[in-house]
Amino acid sequence: MTEFVPLTWHDTLYLAPELILAAMFLILIVTDLILPGRTNRAIIGWLSLAGLLLSLAAVIWRMIDMNPSGVSAAEAAEAGKAISLLGASYRVDDYGNLLKIIFLIGTSLVVLLGLGSTQKDDAVTDKAEFYYLLLPAAAGAMIMASSGNLVTLYIGLELLSITTYVLVGLRKRSSLSAEAAFKYVVTGGIASAFVLFGMSYLYGVTGSVSLADFPTALPQAFTDYKALVYVGFFFLIAGFGIKIAAAPFHIWAADVYQGAPTPVSAFLAVIAKGAALAAVFRFLYSSAFFLTGGPGKQAGDDVFFALLVIAAAAMIAGTVSALRQKQVKRLLALSGVANAGYLLVPIAISVTIIHSNNFSEFVFYLVAYLLMNVGAFAVVTVIARAAGHEELKGFSGLYYRAPWTAAAMLIFILSFSGLPVTAGFFGKLFILLGAASVKAYWLVAIMVVSTVISYYFYFGIIRQMFMRSNGEEEDRIHVPAVTGTVIWICAAATVALGVLPGPLMKWIDAVFTIQADLFVR
């Protein structure tokens, strides 16, 4: 069993990104209490953004330190070793670092999106708690990405969950928000119970909560406790399936996304979903993956096949359910169900000699998904302000009233659709080629068919923007500078990755290694 090693002051330097967020969270609570009631709470938003960027800088600094240039291969390997803290319960490695960068950038864009909104839009972005609650939520996502045992993983999951429960229900005067908060708390509680129940079974059969012990303990336990191992894994899959809104566990998503403030919906769509996927990725490759080569081979194969089935179901259910949607946030929620399926594919096809770069595919598409989702939700805030609602008809004649915003939304729609030249095209292509390389042709067929079907509702938005008129073409839509900045950061990055995907993929492959960064030893 892994021995517990006390945390030293030197070790806290490795935890700087998380500690920065924790310290800023406490500072902002006190600041909010002492500020006069009439003071604009946007200052809390800007301070939250500063804390997120400072944490991001700390993560990047750690990555540079772990991946030095101009040194020998032996020195580079030594510098790149994962750093285990608190008895391997928390890891600092390039797997976690890459995902933390995504989570922090995504949360920063959500804060900017909130700063670009007004009280009229969501009735929450003038409240300080909207901004500072995003900090512990981001910290929870980061903890999930770096967890080295089941306890740490669950703590990160609950930190993320509890803060998002509050964020979803911040619009106290909105019946939709109250309904969304209730549904999210109930389904989130069920998901947490499933995850904890599954963890308890695996702890019971292995005698350890450390992921470092699972590669040896789990195959041994499988011989005597085959049924319990199956139960543990499938409760965990069901629990995380609810968290990522993958079919058939996705029923809550549309109502919650519709009722939540738009920036919160963007956070749930990207950071909350990405954190759960990151946890599944690391957990399965520290447990079920090691069953595939021993007496538990059938169980390991069954776990990964179950993920493939869920991925396929998510792609089909999300796409079909979105066909008749007229409410844009509900449409984006159901689109997110389908995209959860795409993101599960690199995890579920497993690492083989033939196909070993599934993490690169996962990260690339997660980045593409972040950009097109946050950008699309930013456009929704603009439309909702102008039209007074979030229906699809609000996009009518957008090209004539805000041509640059319409152009940006066109980029996001093309990326969602997986068409050139956007990040979504290469993201889906890399995942499709990965599935084809392991001969999962049935899954390739489902990916292609679901993508083609999705053109109907994605192009419906394009048709509204460019081919429909609401008779108010002379009424120009005002786009706040901060919101416009978010939209064009996302649009420019989406096109850049669609034109030059190679540099990002090569960089991920250069800093990430399966043995050192994914497997917990």
From Swiss-Prot:
Membrane topology, record value: Multi-pass membrane protein
Catalytic activity: a quinone + NADH + 5 H(+)(in) = a quinol + NAD(+) + 4 H(+)(out)
Catalytic activity, EC: 7.1.1.-
GO molecular function terms attached to this record: NADH dehydrogenase (ubiquinone) activity; NADH:ubiquinone reductase (non-electrogenic) activity; quinone binding
Superkingdom assignment: Bacteria
Family statement drawn from the similarity comment of this UniProt entry: Belongs to the complex I subunit 2 family.
Assembly description: NDH-1 is composed of 14 different subunits. Subunits NuoA, H, J, K, L, M, N constitute the membrane sector of the complex.
Record function comment: NDH-1 shuttles electrons from NADH, via FMN and iron-sulfur (Fe-S) centers, to quinones in the respiratory chain. The immediate electron acceptor for the enzyme in this species is believed to be a menaquinone. Couples the redox reaction to proton translocation (for every two electrons transferred, four hydrogen ions are translocated across the cytoplasmic membrane), and thus conserves the redox energy in a proton gradient.
Name of the protein: NADH-quinone oxidoreductase subunit N
Organism lineage: Bacteria, Bacillati, Bacillota, Bacilli, Bacillales
Gene name tied to this protein: nuoN
